[in-house]
């Protein structure tokens, strides 16, 4: 049940990030809002890694290179441009495992829309 809640929390972080970008918000604002929600939910020591080795982003653009700019991180004070694609991937990492989501999105004139599954199948798959 604890892992299910962690997944639900990361899906809420994902929805927050997508919501900011959907409205044309800055990538840095998406980071601030997503990180703040994760901290509010108690994940400050496990968001995107474990202290002291946490990554400081929640998503990155995708294109000809695997990781392109802009990034959902501090300092990227610009929106994802129309036609831009981004992998949004909030996760928590613990000593006994990790859980989160990762989907690719495109921003068009109507906002953000998923290119990959984004909930088309059950989020939790146990192996």
Each language-model region and where it sits:
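Active-site neighborhoods and metal-handling regions in enzymes and metal-associated proteins
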Residues: 1-127
């Amino acid at each position: 049940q604890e892992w299910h809640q962690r997944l639900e929390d990361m899906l809420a972080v994902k929805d927050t990030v997508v919501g900011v970008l959907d409205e044309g918000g800055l990538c840095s604002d998406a980071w601030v809002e997503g990180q703040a929600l994760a901290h509010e939910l108690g994940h400050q020591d496990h968001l995107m890694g474990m202290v002291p080795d946490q990554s400081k982003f929640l998503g990155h653009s995708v294109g000809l290179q695997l990781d392109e700019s802009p990034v959902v991180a501090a300092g990227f004070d610009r929106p994802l441009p129309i036609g831009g694609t981004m992998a949004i991937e909030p996760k928590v990492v613990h000593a006994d495992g990790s859980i989160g989501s990762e989907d690719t999105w495109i921003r068009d004139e109507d906002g953000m829309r998923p290119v990959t599954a984004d909930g088309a199948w059950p989020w939790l798959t146990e192996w």
